[in-house]
Structures are given as C-alpha cells and as structure tokens.
Amino acid sequence: MPKALHQSWIDLSAGVPDDGSSIVRFDFSGTFSEGSHEGTVFAGRIEYDPSTPATEHHPSFAIYGQWPAPIVIIAVGGQVLTSAGAAVYDRVDDGRGGHFDFVTMFGTGEIAQQQQSFFELLFSAEDMSMLDGTQMPSARQLQDMPLKQVSFGTSDPADVISRGDLTLHPAG
C-alpha cells in the first residue's frame, strides 16, 4: 500500500472578491519528497473565476503546470476524466448555494480526496521558490489532516508519488 500523503489544508476563501468581478490567481511551487520524482521541483498557477455560477457543471477551477506538476482539478458536479483515468470525488458546499468537488492526482496512479470547507487547498508550510527563481512567502502554520486515497493504474510503488510538499500564495 502507498504511504499516506503528507499534505496540509488552508482556507483561502477570504481571497475571493465579494463582487465576483475578477479572476483570483494563486501561484504554487514545491518538491516531490518521495517516489520516482523525488527531489523534482514543480510550479504552476491556479486561476479561479468567482463569477462562475457554482451550479454549472463544468470545471471552474484548475491548477495549470507542466509535468511533473500535480494535476489538480476542482470541478463543479459530475466526474473528472484525466489522462490517467477517472475518479469520483468528494462534494463540498461552496457557501454560495452550490458545491465544489475535489480531486488531487499525483504521479501516475495516486488520487487523494479530502472533504473540507469551501476553497481549501492542500499545501505545506515550507519555503519554496518558483522555477524562475521568485521566492515564495512563508505559508501560515498549518495542521496536517489525513487524506482518503485510492490507488489505481499502477502496481509499482516507484510509479506512485506518495508525498508532495506544496506552497501557495496569491499571485501578484
């Protein structure tokens, strides 16, 4: 069995504009600490449009990053299909009369799911730098929370990235 993912959660709902008029962006970076990509740095950006109706059935929030960035899609309703397969995931109330569904995929076969309050995203309290050298600010002190996980698509533990350390902050 894969080791439990070491991940943390933080509530970023305060970063969503009240008027819903602008896209919220978060840059992220980190390093894989276990698995076949151990030590590899990844980085990317999250973009979220708070004006998108919460009840629409299409992805309204996604992390964009080049491999081996984690593939993270927060979708509204239904099922997410990825290049590695499909996953049914946890549904959470978004505080606006709708819901979000959380899927986090690491490597080739690791799915981590966690039901939390609106707009909580996994990351750890480590200092990281973006690939272009930009220094990330320190994350707040966080409390680790266990994640439910499902393993599929691989029988080789080396193919499963079982831990990701991630920092996240609002893009400038």
Predicted regions located by residue number:
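An extracellular/secretory-lumen and virion-surface interaction module
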Residues: 2-172
